[in-house]
Amino acid sequence: MQPRTQPLAQTLPFFLGGAPRDTGLRVPVIKMGTGWEGFQRTLKEVAYILLCCWCIKELLD
């Protein structure tokens, strides 16, 4: 006999499982400026993440 399972939507928190669209929770919109500024910010964030990963790897070795 297989264990009884619930549909995924019922097991997720309310904000992921199918809550009404207008719950009053709003995500702030961050203006990135021009396309070049947004690209620079993205590159900086990627470089920061890679540097952190490299540092963690070095610490664990």
From Swiss-Prot:
GO terms for biological process: lens development in camera-type eye. It comes from the Eukaryota. GO terms for molecular function: DNA binding. Restricted to lens epithelial cells. May play a role in lens epithelial cell differentiation. PANTHER family: LENS EPITHELIAL CELL PROTEIN LEP503. This is Lens epithelial cell protein LEP503. It comes from Homo sapiens (Human). The lineage of its organism: Eukaryota, Metazoa, Chordata, Craniata, Vertebrata.
